[in-house]
Amino acid sequence: MTTPPSRLIQSLLLLVTFVVAGCATKDPYHTLGWKLENCAEPSASECGLSYFQEHPDYDLAFAEFTERGNAFNNQWIEDILDRIRARQREGGVVVVTFVHGWKHNAAETDPNLIDFKKALTVIGKGSETLRNRRLVGVYIGWRGASLDLPGVENLTFWDRKSVAEEVGAGGVTKLLLDLDQIDQKQRQNVLVVVGHSFGGAIVVSAVSEILTERAIGRDG
């Protein structure tokens, strides 16, 4: 005769099931390559899945990183940089790089991404300000939301803070260096880097790495 599980075991099983079911994906959200005018219809699935989106008033690139700070796919990052280089040669670029914060990710439904698109739309329609330069948004995605459960996600503060620091010290550093090199091609180019919440920690970590490398380079 089998003994029924105790209430403690039942509670633990229920808790584990609850948490596992609420875990956010560890996979990238944008996996399709660029196609000409792939976001002429923004609601199309092809647009939402693309890691380089060509909207009427701006381009939007997605650079997504693992919790270890590595790019999910280095070729995707190179494709993004190649597209930005091409835009730069056409007449200059204004690149706005945004790193989302804690409890957020690179999903098309994420509030940080939605607000970023709204901001790009407003800037992109100000053609007099851009002066024929192409506006390019770069959305740096990381697993800022490890749990999708309201309330429980607040428990991830210290864990996500640690991940943010590691992401900043990883591939984001190289990405910002590459964007800086593009920016220096013409005086009219502009590069802006913004981080929200723990996204700010990622920016600080990445910039610290860059400044350290440059200081060592001068001394050497």
Predicted segments, located by residue:
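Flexible, membrane-associating and regulatory peripheral segments of lipid-active enzymes
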Residues: 2-14, 19-160, 176-186
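Acidic, His- and aromatic-enriched active-site or binding-groove loops in soluble protein domains
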Residues: 161-169, 216
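P-loop NTPase catalytic core of nucleic-acid-dependent motor ATPases
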Residues: 171-173
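Gly/Ala-rich beta-loop-alpha elbow adjacent to hydrolase catalytic centers
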Residues: 194-195, 199, 203
